[in-house]
């Protein structure tokens, strides 16, 4: 094992991580916190022992492993070879059953290569389609169906969904995806196109957040409006943006968490933007 790999005891098991390649997440573990705990709670509400869960961009398994304990069948995609090795070790260490596939996922089958987006954050690697050592597949080719998917593929979300047309039509899965304005631009995938993809197939979009300590789903009438109000600098000036998650739920499907209206969602978004600005000013003054 590399000297830079360290194992942490977490609420969801023993997890190893490369403390150099994944310095950002390692610091979260060092503080005794769990990376994406809210995401685990959110997805767990949609999964049961009959569900097929897909983790697209599984990284070291922070979502894969706790969800595998609840889902009937779990499939994890991780394109980066070194990260996938750690993922497999973490799965074995925690004695959960996961079908691990060292492949990239996209709109069509082919080849590609891994490119680093941010140093010290291996989870932020992206996939460049073309020539390379990475096998790229579509989910329609790979799978018969799935019920719930988490998608964190650094700007390739729209491409992956276009390769999932049949499953979207036949199985009507719930999809949690990350919105990263910077990476969407890098992959020439407009946010409004991602929004239209889901709404055009009969999906409602929600922004997950905490209200009075409770996890809720905020109705999102427009992803562009949410992004504009949350990160105006990234939206208008192409600055590097932070990310936020959106969950797409088929219309008519029961939602297992409280839903709040659009005005409450926007109230939260504007307050979050203001809090981040105040935080930056305080950091500068101190």
Q: Model-flagged regions — what are they?
A:
Residues 100-103, 177:
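Short loop/edge segments at beta-strand edges and connector loops
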Residues 4-5, 70-71, 141-255:
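Conserved acidic-Pro-Pro-aromatic motif
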Residues 105, 109, 179:
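Short beta-strand-to-loop element that shapes/binds the nucleotide-sugar donor at the catalytic cleft/hinge
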Residues 1-90, 96-99, 125, 129, ...:
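S-adenosyl-L-methionine
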Residues 57, 104, 152:
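The conserved acidic donor/metal-binding loop of glycosyltransferases
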Residues 28-52, 100, 109-113, 120-171, ...:
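Short internal loop-to-helix segment that lines adenine-nucleotide cofactor pockets
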């Amino acid at each position: 094992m590399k000297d830079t790999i360290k194992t942490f005891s977490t609420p969801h098991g023993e997890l190893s991580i490369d403390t150099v390649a994944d310095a950002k997440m390692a610091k979260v573990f060092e503080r005794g916190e769990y990376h994406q705990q809210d995401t685990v709670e959110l997805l767990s509400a949609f999964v049961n022992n009959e569900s097929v869960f897909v983790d697209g961009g599984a990284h070291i398994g922070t979502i894969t492993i706790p969800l595998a304990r609840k889902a009937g069948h779990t499939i994890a995609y991780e394109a980066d070879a070194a990260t996938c090795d750690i993922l497999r070790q973490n799965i074995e260490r925690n004695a959960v059953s996961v079908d691990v596939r060292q492949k990239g996922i996209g709109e069509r089958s082919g080849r590609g290569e891994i490119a680093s987006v941010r140093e010290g954050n291996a989870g932020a690697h992206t996939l460049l389609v073309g020539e390379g050592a990475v096998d790229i597949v579509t989910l329609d080719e790979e799978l018969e169906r799935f019920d719930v998917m988490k998608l964190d593929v650094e700007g390739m979300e729209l491409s992956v969904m276009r390769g999932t047309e049949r499953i979207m039509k036949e199985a009507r899965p719930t999809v949690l995806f990350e919105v990263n304005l910077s990476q969407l631009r890098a992959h020439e995938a407009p946010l409004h196109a991602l929004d239209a993809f889901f709404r055009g197939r009969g999906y409602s979009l929600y922004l997950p957040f905490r209200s009075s300590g409770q996890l809720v789903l905020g109705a999102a009438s427009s992803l562009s409006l949410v992004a504009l109000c949350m990160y105006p600098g990234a939206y208008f000036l192409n600055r590097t943006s932070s990310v936020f998650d959106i969950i797409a739920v088929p219309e008519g499907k029961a939602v297992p968490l409280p839903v709040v209206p659009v005005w409450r969602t926007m109230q939260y978004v504007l307050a979050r933007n203001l809090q981040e600005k105040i935080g930056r000013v305080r950091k500068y003054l101190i």
